[in-house]
């Protein structure tokens, strides 16, 4: 930011400036240590909105492939041991799971907005599933 020349202004007769506390004055007059610039921070929510727009534009899978594959194999072990999967079958399962979760989170967000909140909660997911008829 460029520095600008300050010019004298005529007082408008408002309140007299209050005296600062000694600690505040000392803090303001203390020199900046070595000119270290603090890192830039965005306002709360800005990065979240940017991520929402980015993920809504994209079509790639959001869950990593190998962890998802391990989870599928672990769940399948409970039903039958030594099951084998084609890679296309794992891919189809992952597409279906992600589509289901995205839809569930959309409905959950609508439930939170209906309750005049912006944060989704466990009860919103439960209500969304109940309205869908997935669980009683």
UniProtKB/Swiss-Prot annotation:
Q: Which organism is it from?
A: Lodderomyces elongisporus (strain ATCC 11503 / CBS 2605 / JCM 1781 / NBRC 1676 / NRRL YB-4239) (Yeast)
N6,N6,N6-trimethyllysine PTM positions = 5, 28, 37, 80
**Do the record's keywords include DNA-binding?**
yes
**Cellular localization per UniProt:** Nucleus; Chromosome
- The record's account of how the chain is modified after translation: Phosphorylated to form H3S10ph. H3S10ph promotes subsequent H3K14ac formation and is required for transcriptional activation through TBP recruitment to the promoters. Mono-, di- and trimethylated by the COMPASS complex to form H3K4me1/2/3. H3K4me activates gene expression by regulating transcription elongation and plays a role in telomere length maintenance. H3K4me enrichment correlates with transcription levels, and occurs in a 5' to 3' gradient with H3K4me3 enrichment at the 5'-end of genes, shifting to H3K4me2 and then H3K4me1. Methylated by SET2 to form H3K36me. H3K36me represses gene expression. Methylated by DOT1 to form H3K79me. H3K79me is required for association of SIR proteins with telomeric regions and for telomeric silencing.
Q: What is this protein called?
A: Histone H3.3
Give the CDD domains listed for this entry.
HFD_H3 (cd22911)
Tell me a Gene Ontology molecular-function term this record carries. Answer: DNA binding
Record PTM N6-methyllysine, positions in chain: 5, 10, 19, 24, 28, 37, 80
């Amino acid at each position: 930011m460029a520095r600008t020349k300050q010019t004298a202004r005529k007082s408008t007769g408002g309140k007299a400036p209050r005296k600062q506390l000694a600690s505040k004055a000392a803090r303001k007059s203390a020199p900046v240590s070595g000119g270290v610039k603090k890192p830039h921070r965005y306002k709360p929510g800005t990065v979240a909105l940017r991520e929402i727009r980015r993920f809504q534009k994209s079509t790639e899978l959001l869950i990593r492939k190998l962890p998802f594959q391990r989870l599928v194999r672990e769940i399948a072990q409970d039903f039958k041991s030594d099951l084998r999967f084609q890679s296309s079958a794992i891919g189809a399962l992952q597409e279906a799971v992600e589509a289901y979760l995205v839809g569930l989170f959309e409905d959950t967000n609508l439930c939170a907005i209906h309750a005049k909140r912006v944060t989704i909660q466990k009860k919103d997911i439960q209500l969304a599933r109940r309205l869908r008829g997935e669980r009683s």
